[in-house]
Regions:
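TPR/TPR-like alpha-solenoid repeats
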Residues: 63, 70, 109-110
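Short coil turns that delineate tetratricopeptide repeat
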Residues: 51, 97-98
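Extracellular-facing segments of soluble proteins and assemblies that are Gly/Ser/Thr-biased and enriched
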Residues: 101-110
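N-terminal leader/linker segments that initiate helical-solenoid repeat arrays
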Residues: 4-64
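Surface-exposed, active-site-proximal loop segments in enzymatic domains
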Residues: 24-27, 68-77
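Canonical positions in the second alpha-helix
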Residues: 46, 91-92
Length: 111
């Protein structure tokens, strides 16, 4: 059923659907990597569409934080995701200087 729904959606919608599934199958504070990693891939594709770019950028910040915090147990992989979120956040707060959500998720990725 989920695969059928995802087929008719644009990249942002696919990413959001997977982002919303990020906790499925989680145990305590450990989540499975597939939903969030696949969501990130769809958000990256959604960046290419000006109609979905801004939402995709914000979801990427949220997604890198989630994957670093709840998927990776290896400190280097966690750090890589948090650093990616930080780098993207720095770019996005320059692009959207008055956006509280971008500033918030940038700060969250700083730890």
């Amino acid at each position: 059923m989920v695969a059928h729904v995802i087929c008719g959606q644009n990249e942002l919608e696919k990413g959001i659907a997977l982002f919303n599934q990020r906790l499925e199958g989680s145990v305590k504070s450990s989540a499975k990597p597939e939903p969030i990693t696949n969501a990130i891939s769809h958000f990256q594709y959604a960046l290419k569409n000006s109609a979905t770019e801004t939402d995709a950028e914000l979801y990427l910040l949220k997604s890198y934080y989630f994957r670093g915090k709840y998927v990776h147990k290896n400190k280097e992989k966690q750090k890589a995701d948090f650093n990616r979120g930080k780098e993207l956040g720095e770019n996005y707060i320059k692009k959207y200087p008055d956006s509280a959500p971008f500033r918030y998720w940038y700060l969250v990725n700083l730890g």
